[in-house]
Amino acid sequence: MTIVNIESAPAVESAGSSNPRDYTDIHIRWSLKDGEPHVDCVGSLVFPVVKPGERPRPQRPAKVIYQLLDELAGSCFAVATATKDFLIHHAETNVFFRGRFDDRAVDGTWYRLRVISAKPPRLENLGFPMPTIYVEQLMDPAFARGGLIAVMGQAGSGKTNTASAIVVSRLHRYGGMAFGIEDPPELPLNGWHGEGYCTQASVAGEDGKDWVESMRGALRSQPVGTDLMMYLGELRDASSAQMALRAATNGFLVICTTFASDIISGLEAMLNLAGREHADTLAHTLRVAVYQTLLPAEGRLLVDTLTSDGPTSRVGVILRSGDLRRLEDEIRYQKHQVAAEFARMQAARARAA
């Protein structure tokens, strides 16, 4: 099928690039001609990469990118009929895109594509550095016995990057096996990472049963005696939240992301999703709750954490009570402890220098 007749598209003579890595996002608009789908090259949008602190702005595509739009549209068309969210790979440039099929816009049907890294992130080389003290919290070897790490934040705060980096970094340091269950996979984690291996599954977000079945499959196929992780893009419903807690009590280190305005609201959301009767299980499984805020203009990642040593710890007792507002004092206390430890580390470095 002919996706687009490039020669018939009016030329846009503005400067541009055919390298997809020169863009953060590419939005491809479809139009119908004689009942057949075609790409409207002129009506599409590209968002060029900008300098740190600047915000990408939409531009009309230059003619040099029309062939790329055609190729990407063909890849989208092949997968977007089964799911609205998808991952595609442009083989010629080895660039991955996270895509969304948008058929609700008043000006036509769109493929909204985000360029993603071809190299999985690690905690030590995130785009916006995470302080070492928090990295070491997340790399605690004791977590290999199982539990829950929840990465929280608002939209665009880098939750997926951090959660993925936890998986990759722990596989590199400790080996083992990780199961990724996402809608769709947002970063290319599948494959070997040092002595550890990650396998990714793409599930359809419209049906919660797909999530539960994928999680159940991971539980059934766990290798005996191996360090195990389960990475969930996001908890979607009660069944998946309950299954995540079950996995965390069954030897998996479960890593998930959730939208939140702070740590307490994030834990409240998880508990409400799973059911308040699962407060005791959350108290048994929670290892670290991470809340992060991205400040792109300053090149900074602000991080707060809440760690728990189990159901009899101060955090565990509060979680079991169900009154999560009482965590405020513990969060402040732990933040003070982290600040004091950071000051000691800085002083030690100064003496060593």
What positions do the PLM features span?
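Short, flexible helix-loop junctions that flank or precede catalytic/ligand sites
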Residues: I3-A353
